[in-house]
C-alpha cells in the first residue's frame, strides 16, 4: 500500500520511532554515557517513554544546545516522490541522524559508540515492513558534521511502495 497523502508520513515516522525504541541495545547506547552501556540494566517501557521518546530518539529535526550530553537519534522524512500522474508516493526517503559527543565515542567494546548506534538502527529497520508502506531499504551513511564536541552521522533509508 502506498502513501496516498503526506498526512500518513507522520504516522509512519511514529512507527519507525516505536521500532527503534524497542531495541534495548540501541536504547542502552543512547541512555548510558558510560563506557560499558551493555552492562547497564534495560529500561522499562515506562522509563523509555519518559527518558527516551522525544529526548534521545526524536522526530523533531532540531537538537538544542543543552542536548549534547548524550547521544541522540533524530528521524526525519526527507522526501516523497510521485510516479508521473500517479497521486500516490512511490518512494519515501527517511533520514536518521546520530549525534554523538566525541567524549563518548570510546566504550569498553571492540567498536565505537556511533557505529554501534548506526548498526543497531540498521538492524531495527533494514528489510522490515512498516504498515501502510513497504519494506525499508538502505542504511547508507555519511558524516554530516563534526565539531570539537560532537559528531553527526546521517543514515538514509528508502521505503518503496508497491502497487
Where in this protein do the model-derived segments appear?
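Small/polar-rich, solvent-exposed N-terminal microdomains that initiate assembly or binding
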Residues: 1-83
Amino acid at each position: 500500500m502506498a502513501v496516498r497523502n503526506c498526512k500518513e508520513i507522520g504516522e509512519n515516522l511514529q512507527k519507525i520511532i516505536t521500532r527503534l525504541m524497542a531495541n534495548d541495545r540501541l536504547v542502552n547506547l543512547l541512555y548510558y554515557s558510560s563506557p560499558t552501556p551493555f552492562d547497564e540494566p534495560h529500561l522499562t517501557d515506562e522509563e523509555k517513554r519518559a527518558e527516551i521518546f522525544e529526548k534521545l530518539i526524536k522526530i523533531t529535526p532540531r537538537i538544542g544546545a543543552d542536548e549534547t550530553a548524550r547521544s541522540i537519534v533524530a528521524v526525519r522524512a526527507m522526501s516523497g516522490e510521485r510516479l508521473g500522474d500517479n497521486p500516490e508516493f512511490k518512494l519515501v526517503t527517511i533520514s536518521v541522524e546520530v549525534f554523538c559527543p566525541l567524549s563518548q565515542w570510546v566504550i569498553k567494546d571492540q567498536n565505537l559508540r556511533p557505529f554501534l548506534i548506526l548498526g543497531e538502527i540498521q538492524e531495527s529497520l533494514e528489510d522490515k515492513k512498516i504498515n501502510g508502506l513497504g519494506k525499508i531499504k538502505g542504511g547508507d551513511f555519511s558524516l554530516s558534521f563534526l565539531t570539537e564536541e560532537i559528531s553527526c552521522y546521517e543514515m538514509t533509508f528508502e521505503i518503496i511502495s508497491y502497487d
